């Protein structure tokens, strides 16, 4: 298994975007899978914000994660964000999500980013184990979520 930039594997954009849409599309009313594909395509930077990394086994997609400018409309002052951390169900339990998160943190650190943010409704313990701190609990799009941050530069 290795992690690479999605922009170096454009044939996987549609697959990753579709997986993201199936996982979180219900929380974005009015968004279509086509919109998610376009957003994924636009986010395909390399060594920049935005960028997308993917976990691969050979050429097979296992999961992905994004580094984006903003992910929570309620907190526009917080930037940048780790978003869309997703691992295919059959590949979970192998530490892939942790490796994707670590890679995005490393990307942000290389860019001189002092802090990175995320929000989650279910994976607080995963991120806490990786060193993320709770910022606040709130309701976003009718869903209780936890906003967390990772301090890169102390």
Segments and roles (model prediction):
Residues 108-121:
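Conserved GNAT acetyl-CoA-binding A-motif
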Residues 84-87, 93-106:
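Conserved acetyl-CoA-binding loop-helix of GNAT-fold acetyltransferases
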Residues 52-54, 60-70, 81, 86:
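Conserved beta-strand in the GNAT
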Residues 128-138:
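Conserved acetyl-CoA-binding loop of GNAT-fold acetyltransferases
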Residues 16-24:
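Hydrophobic alpha-helical core bundles mediating ligand binding, dimerization, or RNAP-core interactions
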Residues 26-56, 62:
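Active-site rim helix/loop that mediates acceptor-substrate recognition in acyltransferases
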Residues 2-16:
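A short beta-loop-alpha structural element at the N-terminal edge
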Residues 118-123, 136-154:
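C-terminal "cap" of GNAT-fold acetyltransferases
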